[in-house]
């Protein structure tokens, strides 16, 4: 059984891939104060690939097409 969390913020990120859109990730409460546009974060994309992404924007609205994954870490502030 999967556990669902409530998040205050979500971020839209730019991935280092030839993809035509932004992807939205959930921000864990313990990382909220560290996330801002332009900051690099570590995210999982796909089943096992980890990437460094750049935060494009912050929103309170979760995506409607999919359940967002959490960011794994903030790389720089």
Where does each model-flagged region fall?
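Accessory, non-ATPase domains that flank or precede helicase/AAA+ motor cores in DNA-metabolism machines
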Residues: 1-77
């Amino acid at each position: 059984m999967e556990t669902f969390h409530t998040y205050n913020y979500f971020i839209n990120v730019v991935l280092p891939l030839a993809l035509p859109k932004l992807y939205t990730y959930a921000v864990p409460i313990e990382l909220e104060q560290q996330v801002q546009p332009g900051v690099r974060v570590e995210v999982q994309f796909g089943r096992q690939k980890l990437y460094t992404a750049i935060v494009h924007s912050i929103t309170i609205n979760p995506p409607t097409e999919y359940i967002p994954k959490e960011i794994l870490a903030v790389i720089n502030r």
